[in-house]
Each structure stands twice: as structure tokens, then as C-alpha cells.
Amino acid sequence: MDEKAKFNALTYEAMIYVDTFKKLSTVMGAEGNLIFRFGDTTVDADQIQVAGNVQFNPSKKFAAKQWYHVALVFDGATKRTEIYVDGERVAEKTASVNSFNLNGNFFIGYAYDYDGSRTWRGKMSECRVWSVARTANELKNNKLGVDPNSEGLFGYWKLNGTDVYQKDGNYYVKDQSKNHRDATSRRGAYQNGRGLSVEPDVVEMRISE
């Protein structure tokens, strides 16, 4: 993330589909700061959690081979941090901080540059970062898309196969927001900003309401 990634309020959200559960599987975030992931030494592989400067998890278990919408919402004014699944709040905790600085490495489907094992085994779509605390209704009603010009939309990666382009040997996923924070698509080892850039695989997304 760039130097503007300093948040007094924040929302992570994504559509996720797990092929296989394994320990420490990252959805998105900044390791050691604020990360949204599955599993840990004390958290089962099929349980989602928030870790970093605030840490907690719901008791809810997820099923493999099923689409879910997940969201992490932080409001610095109250320090309340909440986890939502398909628009329903499933856990909350009061953080010890009132802001987050995510300037630096931020990954989707990957943890950090020196542990290539903590990758996402599955699919994702509609990955977004907001500089506002989204409400339950906003999360529930906009799972499959939002207006790219929405107030507070910090970064928006649809991952739908139409937003990928290649430049100078790398593949990028276009940021659909007005902020031009395009993401680099990588696979395998990632060291100090370097690694194999690959074209993302695209599958049909089928959701049963």
C-alpha cells in the first residue's frame, strides 16, 4: 500500500471460495498489522480470524467448495472491530488502537514475502478495501459489485477475468476505483517485491442464494 494507507476507519471485504482448508491461509491484509485469514495455532483451519494489532475469531465454521462474502470492519471512533459473513455480524471486539497504518506490503491471498506456504487455496472475487466502516446493510446488499466511484473506496479488485493486463513482463489486476492501485499477480516465492508474475486463472462463479 502507498503512503495514503492510513485509516481511522477501515473495511476489508471479499467473495471467497475454499477448495481445501489448511492452517494459516490469508484472505487479505498486512502481516503483523491487520490481517484477515483462516486458521492459526489455536484457530481451526476452517475458522476465519482477525490478527495483528487486534486479534479474535468467531466460532463459525466454514464449508469447502462454497462461496461466502466475508468482511472485516473497523471504526476508529469506537475502536469496534467486527467480522461479517454474508452480511451478518458473527464476532466483534474492541481494539486497543484507533487507527491503522497499512503503508507497505499488503497482500491478497498471500501472507508475507518470506513464507510462500501461506497462500490461498481457492478462489476470490470482489476484493475491496475501504477507508470507511461499512454497515451491515451495505455489505449485504453489495456483495457482487459496488459503484467504483463510491465514497471511501480505497481499492477495488474484481478478479473477474476482464480486469487483467500485462505490462513489462508482469500481470496486473486493475483497480476499479478511481485510485489506480493496480495489484501485481504473483505465484510462488515472493522476495522483496520480486517473484514470478502469472496470469490469474478464471472460473465461472455460481452462487445459490
Where are these predicted regions, by residue range?
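Extracytoplasmic low-complexity segments
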Residues: 91, 140-209
